[in-house]
Every structure is written in C-alpha cells, then in structure tokens.
Amino acid sequence: DMSGLIKKGEVGSILNEVDPVRVNALQRVAMEESRLGIPLLMARDVIHGFKTIFPIPLGQAASFNPQVAKDGARVAAVEASAVGIRWTFAPMIDVARDPRWGRMAEGCGEDTYLTSVMGVAMVEGFQGDSLNSPTSIAACPKHFVGYGAAEGGRDYNSTFIPERRLRDVYLPPFEAVAKAGAATFMTSFNDNDGAPSTGNTFILKDVLRGEWGFDGIVVSDWASVAEMMAHGFAADSKEAAMKAVNAGVDMEMVSYTFVKELPELIKEGKVKKSAIDDAVRNILRIKFRLGLFDNPYVDEKRIEELYAPSHLEAAKQAAVESAILLKNEKETLPLQSSVKTVAVVGPMANAPYDQLGTWIFDGDKTKTVTPLKAIKELVGDKVQVI
C-alpha cells in the first residue's frame, strides 16, 4: 500500500511513476496526510531521452561534441519533468575498457577526459540553468566508483584498482561533475579490494564530501546495501545498514534495511543520530533546491510538450553527429543504378523496438523507422528490396 507507507513517513522517493495524475495524487498524500508534509522525489532512469530518444550515450560520445550530450539531456529533462519526474539516474560516467562488460553502451567509453566532458554536459543539460525550474531534473552521476572495471567484464564483480589508478582514470569524471554542481551521486555495486562502494568511507566521505565538497544526496544503487552481504562485507542486513549509513549513504534504493534496522542500530549506539541528521539534511537540501516545497505538483497539461518538433530535430542532429563513417576505399558506394535488388540483412534490419537502443523505458517503437523501411521508402519501386 504505497499511500499507507507515505502517510507513515516511510517513503521519501518513488521510482518509475510516469502518470502525472498519479504523481500528483501521491504528492498530495505526502503533503496533506503525512505528519511532516515533506514532498516526494519522483525518479526514473532517463538515460538518453524520455519520449524523444537520442543516440545511446556511447554513440553521443562518438560525436566528440558535448553540445550533443547537453541538448539531449535538456530535451530529456523537459519531457520527463512534464510527467512529474524530477530525478534521473544519469549520466553513467564509468570509464570502461573491457568490451565484455555488458553496460558499455550506457557510458562514454574508455577515455577519462572524454567521459568527463560529456558527463558535465549531460549534468548541465539535465539540471538546466536552475534546479528549481519546473523543467529541470536532478542528475545522478553513477556508478561511484570503478563499476566499469569489473574483473573479467562480469557485472557486479570485484575490482582491484590501486589508489593512483583510481585517481588517474576512474575518479576524474566524477570530480568534474561534482564541481559542475551534480545534485546527487549513486554508489556502485562493485567492491574495490574487498570494500563495496556502498560501504566505502574513503570514497564517500574522504573523497566525495571531504575533497570535493559535495553536499547533495548519495543514493545506493538498486539494493546495493543488501548486496554487500553477497560480497561478504556484511554478515546480515543489520550490519549492511550500519556500514552503509556510517560510510555516508543517505538514501537506500529498493532494499529495506534502513527502515528495518536503523532504530535498533541507533539504540545500540552503532549508528549515531548525527549520521541520520546528516542524511536527512542532504536529502531535504536537494528537495528544497528543486523547489518541491514551493510546488510539489506537476502541471498535467505539460504532457503536450512530449515529442515537440524541436525535440525531434535535436535528436536527428544528434544521430547525424554520432554516426561513424567507414572509408569507401573500394568504392562500394554509391550503388550503381544498374542494381535492381538490394538485400537488407542483420538483426537490426527490421526490429522497430531495437532502434531505440538500450536502457529505454518510455520510447515508443511505433515511432521508429527501421533500415528496411527507410530504404524501401527511399528507392520506391525502382529497386526490389528484400
């Protein structure tokens, strides 16, 4: 019962609600029926577009043009905020150099500097000129840190990154977005040399807050607090909650160890009340910066802003700039006019949904154009297309 949990003050953020009517109804419960009246923070993975879809981040990075990334994030923010989303779990700025790793497409590749520049551009696009604008959404750079260096390219796996390499290769993109004003950070699933990021005081307190002066929200990745048990870093959910909070995690995503375990941990003195106060301040600070206390509701008429012509034009331009051209050394192109039959082959030839790319929740496959369809429309009845 989501409304019941909100009334009891057990929910501060909600994932994946994209119906503006429902968003407003849940906000009304929080504002009018809970004891403290603190607005909810609505979140969604908006990675490379909301309704208007842009090239995958790896493709955007191939443009070598940060304006492409910034424009894409700005369009995504306008559209996502139109349904009540005010927080996205992006950009992913994990430097990744092992192509076996399954999330390469969500990042910007192997280069630290390019990842830094594109990451900053995305943060600026998502957050706009001011976080309290109703068309801005809080960015959440992820996964902090070293997630893309998982041993053997196996997701969630351990990493073994010495501090010098950490500072030379993997930390710089995160430092860049922190200094660019990123509102939130997400911890990563991996452990580094035995210490999972979600329970790693060195990176969360010493580096992120101490060295870089970050004062926003640190959120765990999906159940990554509980995942510390799988890493052998915590014996049970109680120890996992203790280590996460004491390391500097403000908000737990999905798993329920904070709600379940923190009251007892505080009584036992294993978690100080000051740690809870710090976490609450960090969360409230971002909600204030987003203007949620002034206006927690979304204008339901804004849904008309989806698929605006200017948004589609920006996506087209991004696709053009992201294209990788091959040398025409043997003059394969252009096809000679004598050709009467063209075969369009491959798994992507006529797959409408796959044209959207990875990590898409809200794109509409009926609005895509497959290579097969496009080529048929281009050549008409002059050539047989199979």
Spell out what each predicted region is:
Residues D1-I386:
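Glycoside hydrolase catalytic-domain context in secreted enzymes
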